[in-house]
Amino acid sequence: MNIKKISVSLLTAALLVGCGSGKSSAANTKKDANGRVLPADTGKKDIDSLKFQFVPSRPTDQIIKATSNLGNLFKAKMKEKGYNIGKVDISVSDSYEAAGEALSAGSVDVAWLPGGTYALYSNDSDVVLTATRHGFKNDSTNPKDWNGDANKTQNSDKPVTYYKGLIYAGPSAYGRKLAAKVNAGEKLTWEDLDKAKWAVRDVTSSAGYIYPTMWLQEQCKGKGIKDLSKVTTLNYAAEFQQAAAEQIDIIVCYADGRQDYEKQWQKEWGRKDSIWNELNVIGVTQNVYNDTVTVTMKKPEIYNKEFMTAFQDSIIEISKTEEGKKIFGIYKHSGYAKASDKDYDGARQALKAVQK
């Protein structure tokens, strides 16, 4: 699969969307220093429907089940703030980029996006919240510190605004060879990594593509995922399943994806040993800024200061309830904080780095 061609075409499409003609993306026509349309001060209070969309970083059926009551909770909170919302439709996109494109087109009103996806589509969408999450007791940058039952990842009560991406070697014969080198304190070479069969995520996925590419560039003198010989694009569940089946040597994921697939590793996928012993971390990325909640700029009733403030307050309030914690726990989000576009300048720089 030619990852480079896909990433270039996505960037081109995003730029075309961002520069296209048509109606103004908001009632206000004023623009900021970067040419982005600024939100109007206010908009209408009666809104027939809203469309929320989540990205498929977890299995779609699990996301739909977890978020099934979010619409009702949101409508009630907005009612307290003077808004009458008719209905809230919740869906899961086919890919990260599909959610970004839907926001850009205005066919989706709100989306939960990784920082890298937001950075690519921020000409026509605006971040309003950033996720917070509980960190881990282990925050090491040394990959071997993450491996084995003795180093099983444990959650911390400390909230953090970042997470790490992890590069894992699976239990295939070649994956075990790579893990043995890392656990012995040896550095992996480009030749070592290029011989492996890799599985990655969409090209705007922070932990599934962008930051692993930056890790490769740092380790291998500028080489990235697009330079690897054997790469396939899978969702996270398929990555772990194919690693368990020894069909893939290296997978990439957020820290620590092994928590999400620990039971399946042995009960469903037939592995005899634990995921902590068999799926070894061989690389740790830089810190990734947390996921976003982003609104479209295409609809004046959405893209105005009054609505966005009410939206921010409502989601934050929901996230503090027991039911809200369960809903957003599907993404390991422990809460939300108000955000601004400039918070994701680093994500834009990272995105540019992987396109070189």
Predicted regions and their residues:
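An extracytoplasmic/periplasmic, membrane-proximal ligand-sensing/linker region
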Residues: 30-54, 58-69, 219, 299-356
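Pocket-lining segment of extracytoplasmic ligand-binding domains
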Residues: 182-189, 194-302
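A conserved helix-loop-strand patch within extracytoplasmic ligand-binding domains
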Residues: 133-205
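Short helix-initiation/N-cap motifs at beta->coil->alpha
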Residues: 83-101, 114, 224-245
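C-terminal motif of bacterial Sec signal peptides marking the signal peptidase cleavage site
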Residues: 15-18
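Bacterial signal peptide processing site
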Residues: 20-23
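Beta->alpha turn/N-cap motifs
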Residues: 54-56, 94-96, 106-119, 124-125, ...
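Periplasmic-binding protein-like
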Residues: 49-56, 131-155, 161-164, 269-301, ...
